[in-house]
Amino acid sequence: MKARVLAKTWLTHLAVERGLSANTLSNYRRDVERYCDWLEAAGLDDIRDITTAHVESYVKDLRRGIDGQQALSASSAGRALIVARGLHKFALMEGEVAADVAADVSPPAMGRHLPDTLSINEVALLIDAIPHSDIATPVDLRDRALVELLYGTGARISEAIGLAVDDVSEMPEVLRITGKGSKQRIVPFGSMAQQAVREYLVRARPALSKGKSHALFLNQRGGPLSRQSAWAVLKKTVERAGLDKDISPHTLRHSFATHLLEGGADVRVVQELLGHSSVTTTQIYTHITADSLREVWRGAHPRA
């Protein structure tokens, strides 16, 4: 069977049988199409003709850059390999091949990359840069509610914009957030985030709403706020705050986790709040706090 035909069947399987989110499916589709393009350029149309050496060459080409395209980082090439592995595993499961040629291909070596975070003062500067008094516009109040919720709950941007009005209408002390793979988790809904969301619901959302969407966060046309628009909100807020940092919505999630650990929270509690399936993913934040402690020690200890 042609690899591209099998890839389409596999994506359908992921959508129907695995229930992957639209965003995750979009990422898988992009990566598997890139893999199929590479295979066809190498004269490997049939899934049965591919060997382990071919998969290894694909990963190396990703790191070098394919056909003048920008080279991928080790982590991005590793994710692309995961998709290629998934396709070959599916080929074996469907009886199209006798062996999984990608199973033993190693991902590119990665150095430890610590996520960017904000200090507690920088978070305060970011939030306070958004007007919230009587001069605040409906968009200002929406933006403040979004940023407060992202930092206050550690939600991913896709999770935050996926919230409905009914999820927060009674201002519960905890929020039920739907994450990757439609998995739900419970996170505390703190007083500052509640206050910002309440003010948005009372003073701003009715002005934005055209009565056609149940989404919590709306754009100026009354539709659900998109991921791209949410990124733009944060970029505008960073400029207002005068912060000379490259800050994304995920930076607030990283900061949420780091500040919890610095405050003494158990790493497994933080794992649950973030919705990580493995504590190993969460433990990267313990490296951040350890690095911070070392910097304080170097500056303060007489024997440093």
From Swiss-Prot:
Start and end of every Core-binding (CB) domain?
Answer: 1-92
Reply yes or no: does the keyword Chloroplast apply.
Answer: no
What's one Pfam family here? Phage_integrase
Instruction: Return the InterPro entries for the record.
Output: CB, DNA_brk_join_enz, Integrase-like_cat_sf, Integrase_catalytic, Integrase_recombinase_N, Integrase_SAM-like_N, Recomb_XerD, Tyrosine_recombinase_XerC/XerD
Question: Residues of the signal sequence?
Answer: none
Q: Which UniProt keywords apply?
A: Cell cycle, Cell division, Chromosome partition, Cytoplasm, DNA integration, DNA recombination, DNA-binding
The terms describing its cellular component in GO are: cytoplasm
Where does it mainly reside? cytoplasm
Molecular function per GO: DNA binding; tyrosine-based site-specific recombinase activity
Q: Where is the active site?
A: 156, 180, 250, 253, 276, 285 (o-(3'-phospho-dna)-tyrosine intermediate)
Give every Tyr recombinase domain span.
Answer: 113-298
Which GO BP terms, alphabetically? cell division; chromosome segregation; DNA transposition
- Cell location: Cytoplasm
Q: Which NCBIfam families match?
A: PRK00283.1, recomb_XerD
What does this chain do? Site-specific tyrosine recombinase, which acts by catalyzing the cutting and rejoining of the recombining DNA molecules. The XerC-XerD complex is essential to convert dimers of the bacterial chromosome into monomers to permit their segregation at cell division. It also contributes to the segregational stability of plasmids.
Q: Which family does it belong to?
A: Belongs to the 'phage' integrase family. XerD subfamily.
**How does it associate, per the subunit comment?**
Forms a cyclic heterotetrameric complex composed of two molecules of XerC and two molecules of XerD.
Q: What is this protein called?
A: Tyrosine recombinase XerD
Q: What is the lineage of its organism?
A: Bacteria, Bacillati, Actinomycetota, Actinomycetes, Mycobacteriales
Report which gene this protein is encoded by.
xerD
